[in-house]
Every structure is written in C-alpha cells, then in structure tokens.
Design a protein with these regions (language model features):
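Conduit-forming functional cores of very large proteins
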Residues: 1-176
Length: 176
C-alpha cells in the first residue's frame, strides 16, 4: 500500500459501518416538523424552483430554504432528536439534498469546530464518554437508543432547545 498505509490504518480503526433504521419515522418528521412539502401538493412550476429532498434514494418532497433545512437537521442530530448515523448531503449543482438512513454505509467521525476555530470539546468541563461525544452530554432517558427517534419532551423532558444545544454532540459521522 506504500504511502497510503497511514490512511488505510486510520480508516480501519476509526470507520464504522452503519446499522441502519427505517426511513418512515424520518420521512414523517421531515413532513411534519421540517416543512418538507409533499410532491402531490406542488405544481410543476413550484418544483422547478425548489430543492428536492431524497431519503434513501426516494424523492419524498421539496423545500424552499436548503441552508436553514440542513443547519436545523444537523442541530437536531447533534442533540439526538435524529439518530446520529443519519447522513445528509446537499448537492448544490443539482439542487438536491440526500439523506441516508440505510445500513452498510462506511462512515467516520469528525470533530465540529466552533466559530473561534477551536474544537467544540474545549467547552466541556467534565469527562466525556463515547455516547456524550456522538449524542451530546444532556441528561437523557435511561433506555436511550441512538437509532430510535424521540420527541424532545420524551427524551429530555421540559428542557428548551437552546439549553440542549449548549451540550450538543461534538462528533459527527460523515459517509466515507
């Protein structure tokens, strides 16, 4: 393997194969909470101007504001309201957002960097576990599962989203 041996070793040690989960709860969440417009409610002229949203290769609807959509999606994933192994990618040239929930994808963790160009983990004052790194360090229900959708109230009780964002995940999984 020559010069790529370090890269191969890193990928072998840090990579993770996703287990996957059903796309149906995510599609329901996208239509109800993310304002993804269903195709049957849109006219052809509207579809031409909007961004297409695909989940596991299926066109499930369209949106108007892809920046707000992807930022909100990632924030909800960082506070575990969307499973951590869900990937999102915005293809600007084709005006398509791809979301994947299927199993068998090779992914690897990356650190989030805050606005001061420091890793987000420097904001933590306590010891971190792997679950804290990928799901945030907010207190969750006892039988928390990273591949299940939870409502904010069921997972965290009455806490406000702004409070949850302070202790959000500092690692993200990206597809390799």
């Amino acid at each position: 393997d020559g010069g790529n041996i370090g890269f191969h070793k890193h990928m072998a040690m840090m990579s993770h194969i996703t287990a996957g989960y059903s796309k149906e709860p995510l599609i329901s969440l996208l239509h109800n909470e993310f304002n993804v417009k269903q195709l049957r409610t849109l006219k052809a002229k509207q579809l031409n101007r909007m961004i297409k949203v695909f989940v596991n290769g299926h066109w499930i609807g369209s949106i108007d504001d892809p920046i707000l959509f992807t930022e909100t999606f990632k924030e909800q994933r960082r506070i575990s309201l969307i499973p951590a192994q869900t990937s999102i990618a915005w293809n600007i040239q084709e005006n398509i957002i791809f979301i994947n929930t299927d199993g068998g994808r090779l992914c690897r963790p990356i650190f989030y960097i805050d606005s001061e160009r420091k890793p987000s983990y420097e904001n933590y004052s306590h010891a971190l576990t792997w679950n804290n790194l990928i799901c945030g360090s907010n207190k969750k229900i006892d039988d928390f599962n990273t591949n299940i959708f939870y409502s904010k109230d069921k997972l965290y009780g009455e806490k406000k989203v702004e409070t949850l964002i302070k202790n959000r995940a500092i690692l993200d999984f990206i597809d390799s």
